[in-house]
C-alpha cells in the first residue's frame, strides 16, 4: 500500500478541531445551498445538452453555430453559468477551508498508521514462513508410525462395532419378549446406524445381520400395531376397559357383580341409570387427556413404566393409562418412520375389529346360555312384544348390549386420542388430517346400524307389507313410483328374467352358491362391475340371539343412548362439517327407520291378532253380550300397545299418531265389515228397502234426531219411510221376505251393534287431552329427551279368561293427546259413533220393514171386510208380526243395553198407525163386522207394543182406532172430530177414505141393485150426502192449504228476523 504514501513536501498539516459559531455554520450552509441551486439548474435547463456522455468538442462546435439549430444563442448564458458556478465554488471553499484542513490532517494520520501496520504484518509473515520451513522438514519414520497408528485405530473401531452389531439382534429379541418396545427401537436405530457405516457396509458377512434387523423392525411394528388394537378393542386384560370407561355402570348391569338380592332391585337400578351423568364421567378421562396434550404440545416424553407409560404429556389421571399406552406405542412407531403406515392399517382394520366386538360379545352369550337361547326361538310365537323384563334372558341380553356399546365407546375414544396424538406427532399444514377419524367414525355408525337392523328389522314384516308404506298422518299409500334409470344395468341376476319362472329361483340359488364359496360375499344390486375383483367390506350377517323385533329396543335403548350421548362431542371440530354426529345419527335412525318399523309392526300385529281371525267369531263380554272376538282381540292388542308405549304418562307425537293410525285402521276394518255385511249402497244393484232408506238423507237426519231424543219427528219419519213404498198394501207393490234380514244376518247385525257399543264403552275413556306449548325453535337433542321419546314399557299380562277388563283394573290406561291428535282421535270415535248410528238405524228399519210387510200382507190377504158374521180371531199376519216382534225384542234385550233396545222400538206405534190408515185404501167395502175385526187386531197389536216398551204409556194407537171407528159412524161425527182436531195426522186423502168407507156398504148395495136392473153398468151409484161431504172436505183442503202457506210465511219471517237480530249483535 505504498501508493497511499503522500509526497513529502513542505510542512505537515496539523490536526486541530475548532468549534464553529452559529453564524459560520449558517454561512457554510448557505454557500452549499447556492452551489446546489446551480446544480439543480443544470439538471433542469441543461440536462439535454450536458450529461455524463457529452463530448466537449461537439459542445464547443454547437456554441459556435449561430444557426437556428445551434447553441450560439445560449453561449452567453453558458459563460454566465460557468462564472456563477466558479464563484459559488470559491465561496464554498472559503467557507469550508477550516473543515477541509482538518480532514486533510486526519487523512495524513490515517496513512501513517496504515504504513506501520503493513510493516508489522510483513515481519510476522516472514517469521511464520521461517517456522513453517523448519516444521515441514522431512521425517520419514515419524510419518510411517503415524499411518500405522491410524490404521490400527480404525481396525479396532470396526471390530468393536462388529461385536456390538452381533449382540444387537439378541438384545432386541430379549426386549421384544419383555415388551420393552422403546429399548427395541433404540437398539434398532443403533444397529442401522452401524450398518450404514462405510467400514461395515462393504462387509458381506454382515448382510444377514442387516436382514435380521429389518425383520425385527417389521416384527416390532406388528407388535406395536397389535397391542394398539388390543387396547382399543379391549382384547387383552392389560387395560381393563370397564375401569377405564365407567366402573359404576358395570356394577349395575353385570349380573355376576351387582350383588343384588332380588330381581326387582336389579331392574330398578337398570331403569334408573342416569345416562347424562354417566356420559360425563366416561368422557372425563378423554377430555382430561386431550386437555393435557394441548397444554404440553411438543413436550414429548417417554416413560417405559407400564403404570405411567406416556408418550406425550403425562396425564394426571391414572385411568388414562390406555390412552397413554397408545400414545407411547405411536411415538415408538413414529421413531421408526412408519406412522403413516400405522394410521392406514388402523383405519383399514377398523370395520373388521368393530364387527368382531359384536361377534365376540354375542358368541360369549351363546356359549354361556345355549339352553336359554333355544327357548328364545319360540318366543316370537308366544309373545309379540319381545322379551319380558322378568325373563332372565332379557337381563342377559341387556348386559350383552351394554358390553357391546361400552366397548364401541372405548374404541372410538381411543381413535379420538390417536387423532389428537397424530396432530402432535405428525403435524400437517394441509386441510386433511393425517389420521382419518371421520372414516372410522362412519364405519362405526355403519356397524351400529347393521346391529340394530339385525335385532330390529323383522323380515316377516317387510314381506307381509309388500312394499307398501303408511305415512305417519294415517293414510295408507303405496311407495312412490321411482323414475326409470337413464343408464340401466346391463345385467343383474335377479332382473334378467321377465316373469317369475323357475329360472329366477335358479338365479337366487346361484347367488346362494356364490355366498357359500366366498364367505362374506353377497351379490348386490349396486355392485361395481368395472372390475372383476370384489371390493366389499361387508360381513356375512350373523344370526341374532333372539328373533328380531322393534320391541328388542327395550334392551338396546339405554346402552345405545349412553353411547350416543358420550360420543356427541367426540368428532373433532375440524371434521364436524362433513361428519354426522351421534345424536343426529340416533335421531335420524329412530325417525326414518325405527318409527316406520313400529308402524309396520303395529300393522302386522293387527293382521295377526285381528284381521286373520274369523270376523264373525263370538265371545262373551263382561256384560254377557255376544260380541265379535275381533273387538276383544283389538282391545287386548290396543291395551298392550298403550302400556308398552307408556301413553298414560308421556305424549310422543309420532308414536301417538302410529297408535291413532292403528285405531283408524281398526275402524276402517269394521267399516269394511259393515259394508260387506249390509251390501252395496247402490240402489240400482239391490232392491232391499233398507238400503233405499239408508240412502234417504232426510230420513237419516230424522233418525239421527230421534236417536238423540227428539220424539216429535215420528210422523215425519213415517212419511219418509212410505215414500219408497206408497202402495205397500197392493200385491206386487209391497215388501217381500227378501227385503227383511234373515235370522243369521239379523243376529250378526245385533252382535256387530253390541261390539261397536262395547268399543264405545271403553275407547273414548282412554283419551286424556293435554296442552302442549309449541316451541318456535327445534329443541336441542340430548339423551334425556331422546330417552323419553323412545322408552318402552312392558306389555300387560292380560287375563285371558276375562280379557275385557275395564281400564281401571288394567292400570288406569290412558293415551295423552294434544289438540291435533285429539281431533284425529275424536274423528275415529265419531266414525264408530256413526257406525253405531247406522247399525241401530238398520235395526230400526228392519223392524219397521217387518211391520210394513206383515201389515201389507194383512191388507193383501184380507179380501172381505163386510162379512156377515162377526169374528174375534186374530189375523195370522198380525199374529206373525207380534211373534216376530217378541222374538226380536228378546234378541235385542240379550244383546243390547236397555237404552239402545228402547231406541229401536220407539215410534214404532206411529209407523203402524200410518200403515194401518194408509192400508184402508185397499178396502172396498167395510161394515161393522169388518170394523170390529180391524179394531180387534189393532188393539192386540197395541197391547203387544206396550208389553215390548219400557214406557207403555207412550204407546198410542188411538189414531188408528178412531180412524176405523169413524168409518162406522156418520159424516157429521167425522166433521166433529175434524173440528176438535182429534185427527191431527190424517191427511185430506185419509179423511176422504173415511167418508168412502162410511158410505161403502150403502154404495155397494146400490151397486148390487143396479147390477140386476136393465141399466147395468151404465150409471154409477151416487149418494147426495157423500157428494156434499166430499165437497165440504175439498173446501176444507183449500182452506188448509192457504192456512199452511200463511204458517210457512210466518215461520220464514220469524227465521229472517232472528238472523237479522243475530247479525246486529
Swiss-Prot record:
Q: Which InterPro entries match?
A: Sec8/EXOC4, Sec8_exocyst_N, Sec8_M
What species does this protein belong to? Saccharomyces cerevisiae (strain ATCC 204508 / S288c)
PANTHER family registered for this protein in UniProt: EXOCYST COMPLEX COMPONENT 4 (PTHR14146:SF0)
* Protein name per UniProt: Exocyst complex component SEC8
Provide the alphabetized UniProt keywords: Cell membrane, Coiled coil, Cytoplasm, Exocytosis, Membrane, Phosphoprotein, Protein transport, Transport
Main localisation: cytoplasm
Q: Which Pfam families match?
A: Sec8_C, Sec8_N
Subcellular location(s) of the protein: Cytoplasm; Cell membrane
Amino acid at each position: 500500500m505504498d501508493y497511499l504514501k503522500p509526497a513529502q513536501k513542505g510542512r505537515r498539516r496539523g490536526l486541530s478541531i475548532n468549534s464553529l459559531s452559529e453564524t459560520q455554520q449558517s454561512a457554510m450552509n448557505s454557500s452549499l445551498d447556492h452551489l446546489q441551486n446551480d446544480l439543480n439548474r443544470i439538471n433542469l435547463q441543461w440536462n439535454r445538452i450536458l450529461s455524463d456522455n457529452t463530448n466537449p468538442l461537439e459542445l464547443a462546435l454547437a456554441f459556435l453555430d449561430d444557426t437556428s439549430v445551434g447553441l450560439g444563442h445560449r453561449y452567453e448564458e453558458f459563460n454566465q453559468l460557468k462564472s456563477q458556478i466558479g464563484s459559488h465554488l470559491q465561496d464554498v471553499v472559503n467557507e469550508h477551508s477550516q473543515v477541509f484542513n482538518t480532514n486533510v490532517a486526519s487523512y495524513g494520520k490515517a496513512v501513517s498508521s496504515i504504513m506501520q501496520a503493513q510493516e508489522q504484518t510483513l515481519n510476522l509473515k516472514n517469521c511464520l514462513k521461517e517456522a513453517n520451513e523448519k516444521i515441514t522438514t522431512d521425517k520419514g519414520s515419524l510419518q510411517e508410525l503415524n499411518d500405522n497408528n491410524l490404521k490400527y485405530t480404525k481396525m479396532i473401531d470396526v471390530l468393536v462395532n462388529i461385536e456390538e452389531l452381533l449382540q444387537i439382534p439378541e438384545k432386541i429379541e430379549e426386549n421384544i419378549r419383555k415388551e420393552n418396545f422403546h429399548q427395541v427401537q433404540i437398539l434398532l436405530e443403533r444397529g442401522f446406524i452401524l450398518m450404514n457405516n462405510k467400514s461395515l457396509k462393504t462387509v458381506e458377512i454382515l448382510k444377514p445381520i442387516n436382514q435380521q434387523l429389518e425383520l425385527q423392525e417389521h416384527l416390532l411394528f406388528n407388535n406395536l400395531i397389535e397391542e394398539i388394537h388390543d387396547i382399543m378393542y379391549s382384547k387383552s386384560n392389560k387395560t381393563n376397559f370397564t375401569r377405564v370407561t365407567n366402573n359404576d355402570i358395570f356394577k349395575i348391569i353385570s349380573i355376576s357383580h351387582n350383588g343384588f338380592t332380588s330381581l326387582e332391585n336389579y331392574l330398578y337400578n337398570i331403569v334408573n341409570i342416569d345416562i347424562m351423568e354417566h356420559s360425563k364421567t366416561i368422557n372425563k378421562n378423554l377430555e382430561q387427556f386431550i386437555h393435557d396434550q394441548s397444554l404440553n404440545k411438543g413436550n414429548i416424553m417417554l416413560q417405559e413404566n407400564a403404570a405411567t407409560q406416556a408418550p406425550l404429556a403425562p396425564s394426571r389421571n391414572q385411568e388414562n393409562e390406555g390412552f397413554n399406552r397408545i400414545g407411547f406405542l405411536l411415538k415408538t412407531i413414529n421413531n421408526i418412520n412408519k406412522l403413516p403406515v400405522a394410521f392406514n392399517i388402523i383405519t383399514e382394520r377398523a370395520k373388521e375389529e368393530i364387527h368382531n366386538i359384536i361377534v365376540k360379545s354375542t358368541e360369549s352369550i351363546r356359549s354361556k346360555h345355549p339352553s336359554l337361547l333355544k327357548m328364545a326361538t319360540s318366543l316370537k310365537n308366544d309373545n309379540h312384544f319381545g322379551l319380558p323384563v322378568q325373563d332372565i334372558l332379557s337381563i342377559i341380553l341387556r348386559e350383552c348390549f351394554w358390553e357391546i356399546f361400552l366397548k364401541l365407546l372405548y374404541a372410538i375414544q381411543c381413535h379420538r386420542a390417536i387423532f389428537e396424538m397424530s396432530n402432535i406427532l405428525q403435524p400437517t399444514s394441509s386441510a386433511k388430517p393425517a389420521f382419518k377419524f371421520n372414516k372410522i367414525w362412519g364405519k362405526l355408525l355403519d356397524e351400529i346400524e347393521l346391529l340394530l337392523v339385525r335385532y330390529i328389522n323383522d323380515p316377516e314384516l317387510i314381506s307381509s307389507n309388500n312394499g307398501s308404506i303408511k305415512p305417519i298422518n294415517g293414510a295408507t299409500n303405496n311407495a312412490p313410483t321411482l323414475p326409470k334409470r337413464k343408464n340401466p344395468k346391463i345385467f343383474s341376476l335377479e332382473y334378467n328374467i321377465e316373469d317369475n319362472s323357475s329360472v329366477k329361483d335358479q338365479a337366487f340359488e346361484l347367488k346362494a352358491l356364490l355366498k357359500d364359496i366366498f364367505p362374506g360375499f353377497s351379490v348386490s344390486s349396486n355392485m361395481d362391475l368395472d372390475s372383476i375383483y370384489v371390493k366389499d367390506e361387508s360381513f356375512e350377517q350373523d344370526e341374532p340371539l333372539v328373533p328380531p323385533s322393534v320391541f328388542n329396543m327395550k334392551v338396546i335403548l339405554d346402552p345405545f343412548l349412553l353411547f350416543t350421548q358420550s360420543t356427541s362431542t367426540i368428532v373433532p371440530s375440524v371434521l364436524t362439517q362433513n361428519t354426522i354426529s351421534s345424536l343426529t345419527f340416533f335421531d335420524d335412525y329412530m325417525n326414518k327407520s325405527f318409527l316406520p318399523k313400529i308402524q309396520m309392526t303395529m300393522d302386522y300385529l293387527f293382521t295377526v291378532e285381528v284381521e286373520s281371525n274369523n270376523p264373525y267369531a263370538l265371545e262373551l263380554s263382561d256384560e254377557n253380550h255376544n260380541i265379535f272376538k275381533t273387538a276383544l282381540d283389538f282391545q287386548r292388542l290396543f291395551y298392550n300397545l298403550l302400556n308398552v308405549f307408556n301413553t298414560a304418562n308421556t305424549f310422543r307425537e309420532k308414536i301417538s299418531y302410529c297408535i291413532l293410525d292403528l285405531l283408524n285402521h281398526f275402524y276402517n276394518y269394521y267399516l269394511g265389515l259393515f259394508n260387506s255385511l249390509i251390501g252395496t249402497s247402490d240402489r240400482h244393484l239391490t232392491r232391499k228397502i233398507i238400503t233405499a232408506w239408508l240412502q234417504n238423507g232426510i230420513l237419516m237426519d230424522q233418525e239421527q234426531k230421534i236417536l238423540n231424543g227428539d220424539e216429535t219427528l215420528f210422523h215425519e219419519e213415517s212419511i219418509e219411510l212410505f215414500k219408497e213404498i206408497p202402495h205397500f198394501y197392493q200385491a206386487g207393490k209391497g215388501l217381500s221376505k227378501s227385503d227383511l234380514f234373515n235370522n243369521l244376518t239379523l243376529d250378526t247385525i245385533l252382535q256387530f251393534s253390541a261390539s261397536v257399543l262395547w268399543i264405545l264403552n271403553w275407547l273414548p275413556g282412554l283419551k286424556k287431552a293435554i296442552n302442549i306449548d309449541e316451541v318456535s325453535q327445534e329443541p336441542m337433542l340430548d339423551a334425556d329427551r331422546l330417552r323419553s321419546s323412545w322408552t318402552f314399557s312392558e306389555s300387560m299380562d292380560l287375563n285371558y279368561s276375562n280379557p275385557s277388563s275395564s281400564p281401571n283394573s288394567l292400570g288406569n290406561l290412558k293415551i295423552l293427546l294434544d289438540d291435533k291428535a285429539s281431533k284425529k282421535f275424536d274423528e275415529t270415535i265419531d266414525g264408530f259413533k256413526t257406525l253405531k248410528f247406522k247399525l241401530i238405524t238398520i235395526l230400526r228399519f228392519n223392524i219397521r220393514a217387518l211391520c210394513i210387510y206383515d201389515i201389507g200382507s194383512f191388507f193383501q190377504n184380507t179380501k172381505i171386510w163386510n162379512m156377515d158374521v162377526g169374528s174375534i180371531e186374530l189375523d195370522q199376519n198380525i199374529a206373525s208380526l207380534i211373534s216376530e216382534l217378541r222374538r226380536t225384542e228378546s234378541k235385542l234385550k240379550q244383546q243390547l243395553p236397555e237404552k239402545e233396545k228402547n231406541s229401536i222400538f220407539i215410534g214404532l206405534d206411529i209407523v203402524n198407525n200410518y200403515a194401518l190408515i194408509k192400508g184402508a185404501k185397499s178396502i172396498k167395502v167395510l161394515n161393522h163386522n169388518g170394523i170390529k175385526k180391524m179394531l180387534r187386531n189393532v188393539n192386540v197389536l197395541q197391547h203387544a207394543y206396550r208389553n215390548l216398551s219400557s214406557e207403555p204409556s207412550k204407546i198410542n194407537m188411538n189414531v188408528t182406532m178412531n180412524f176405523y171407528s169413524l168409518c162406522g159412524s156418520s159424516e157429521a161425527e167425522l166433521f166433529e172430530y175434524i173440528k176438535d182436531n182429534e185427527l191431527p195426522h190424517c191427511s185430506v186423502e185419509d179423511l176422504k177414505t173415511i167418508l168412502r168407507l162410511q158410505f161403502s156398504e150403502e154404495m155397494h148395495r146400490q151397486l148390487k141393485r143396479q147390477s140386476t136392473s136393465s141399466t147395468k153398468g151404465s150409471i154409477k151409484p151416487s149418494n147426495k150426502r157423500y157428494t156434499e161431504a166430499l165437497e165440504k172436505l175439498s173446501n176444507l183442503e183449500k182452506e188448509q192449504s192457504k192456512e199452511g202457506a200463511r204458517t210457512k210465511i210466518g215461520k220464514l219471517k220469524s227465521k229472517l228476523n232472528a238472523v237479522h237480530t243475530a247479525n246486529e249483535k
